[in-house]
């Protein structure tokens, strides 16, 4: 237990149980010194053994602290405490010679603090440069009371401004020459929530709190400070740090002659007449420097030197008319009523989501179900309260005891560390909470929690709720021959679009903290806090994920405390000549090895080449290009999940407010009667042309049939199924049969299909079983023994083609049977790749000679470009046969779809919209593209219901 009490009466000298920090799996970290970290014994903390306290640092409490959490330590003002680990940012791990626990860093002050390596905010200025330093830096400048007498110069690599290699190119190189190394390893109780995660201070605050007092007095003889101490710019501590650092940096480094960054010189304060002028010049210089990439860093570490971090925040200014402020990419918003401020005045609202919650909010009786929200207001002269709307990531248990024992509450505080008080005016509907915020303050912190009443140990609040956690995959903007992907687990559904990541290890001194982009995320229900194993697989043998199949561990206590966990997976390309985007599969396993969640993510493209681009038309896919954008979720693995035919419980329901009977029948547009109830697969809308103009449509289920219903004709009533809902229940088997209707009308190229399946199906036996060839031997599919698994897969596919083309048996559709089999073994990524190819080829054949009109609607292609597409297909006389018109059309559609992006839904949606815009659109007679649009928008619903590891009522989409 992190806050395990250690009694001074215990003198047996036996080592105590390992702390949670020591339980972290460091097997994946290359530095062997982590395995040598020792844990303090109880006897080593006795006061009568002063030699044991050489490795801990003494602080004094500046205010009282009374905890309400078993992991924190109680102390009074003036009491002396001893810090064991100060890497936690807002919370330090300390002891008072009697017991151990966490203390808020803002409540204590180090002795002789001006010479310590702690900033005035109580946070470490930067992450440690290596794992060895992680142990050495806990000796926080040796004896704090005698730090001025030290002979060694302390390393300043903790400071992000003083790193030897950072994204600001004008800060390259050390500020002070290193004369001595740090002391040897110390035996300390190293408690690391996440050894790969930066502190919250680094992620959310600008690293400008730099103190030159960090340098010991002995170093002042080596470096002459060319700044006068009576300069008025340096009366403020922060301004002193920034300005003197800039001057010292400019003096200590001579830029290389002819360097690109030679002109980026930091301004000197003596050049300006006022503090404000200097501040403006310094900020402009800093902005210019940050806009420049460190080319040396990009060359050494491709894929890491990307950009500066971006916060998940928003700032809006509203007038007396009111409005709403929504946090980007989240379901969090603030509703501002009309006349909130007086006429002519404005209210500026800043909304920010803090990823890590305060430690005291997560324990046996309480757990956070939303991020901590920081709300800042500029105008306190208000006439009405605000309304905060948050979607929570939890569902209360279905039994009556859970509803009585646990409730959703909103807590509010004026400080991030607390204390937090309950807000009474709270309203819930479904998974959305509305909170009325009155008694407004300039800065407020709000969080939603699930809090238990009368819960007695060993029970916890987790036993009465179904809490959802989010697993996200982050990576660089462009992939490189060697890069790193990061799997992150959040205790809520707010996964930011970008994330600052520091790697703590032997290579940390070669790469600066960087911002990675969110590639994909998924939510799943975590039944209880437990150790989770996270694995990462690649679908292409050309890419190797280090420790991806064995996985990396996230400890249960980290999840219980709501900490954000970051796990880094290095990825290397075996052959850089074939560098291309590929698919990664994220898998989360529980303690017993069962799969809790898995999903697939398509990586970004490699960086564009700077050379001259070919202006010629794109030809047919070459064989080596086929596997570039395959989204196979289970490639190269032989264990496929089982398709389960069970009810689809994620439907929403709506009441039909209009009767529709169609004169021209369309198999994909529903007919319905006013007053009936219809099931909706989701509230996402599809854009489609109706009888006269474009409309928005829902995918609905009515009277046993799946199709589109005009959104204006449906009044959505919620997730509860009405008792008078008629028609058969929608199951995964029925849904699969309904969405496969258009597949048999699509055109395909067999050679391309065969190549894709050979590259992405890992087991012929599973493939054959899914096609209905259960218990048939391999000899049924091929006459000779085949050694290669890919050839066996090809033989099964060939057998399917023969049976579908034979006249003796019942006629079957090759496309439909193939797609159905792939969906039953959860190869959704491969399915959408095939469907997109089928749709593009079928459209090219259907459009044929009218492809030029379609090209104008989709991309406004010039006449010269059209000639370029047709030129390769003309005969010797320069003529293009009408029967060959599909070839330039197919070339164009392939090129156009690649420019749209990786979203197969967007490609098919935009293609349908472009066809609708044509004169006498072919979609009037060829309606199966509409069915394909329904198909691709229903896949996620089908997969979530058919392969969910939860019970049907707990199904997570």
Swiss-Prot record:
SH3 domain mapped to chain residues: 54-113, 649-719
**Pfam family example for this protein?**
SH3BP4_C
Q: Which residues form the ZU5 domain?
A: 312-449
Q: Which InterPro entries match?
A: DEATH_SH3BP4, SH3-like_dom_sf, SH3_domain, SH3BP4_C, SH3BP4_SH3, UPA_SH3BP4, ZU5_dom
Give the keywords, sorted: Coated pit, Cytoplasmic vesicle, Endocytosis, Membrane, Nucleus, Repeat, SH3 domain
> Which SMART domains does the protein's record reference?
SH3
Q: In which compartments does the protein localize?
A: Membrane, Clathrin-coated pit; Cytoplasmic vesicle, Clathrin-coated vesicle; Nucleus
GO BP terms = cellular response to amino acid stimulus; endocytosis; negative regulation of cell growth; negative regulation of cell population proliferation; negative regulation of GTPase activity; negative regulation of TOR signaling; positive regulation of autophagy; protein localization to lysosome
Chief localization class? membrane
The protein's job, in short, is: Possible role in regulating endocytosis of the transferrin receptor at the plasma membrane. Alternatively, may function as a negative regulator of the amino acid-induced TOR signaling by inhibiting the formation of active Rag GTPase complexes. Preferentially binds inactive Rag GTPase complexes and prevents their interaction with the mTORC1 complex inhibiting its relocalization to lysosomes and its activation. Thereby, may indirectly regulate cell growth, proliferation and autophagy.
Q: What is this protein called?
A: SH3 domain-binding protein 4-B
Gene that codes for this?
Answer: sh3bp4-b
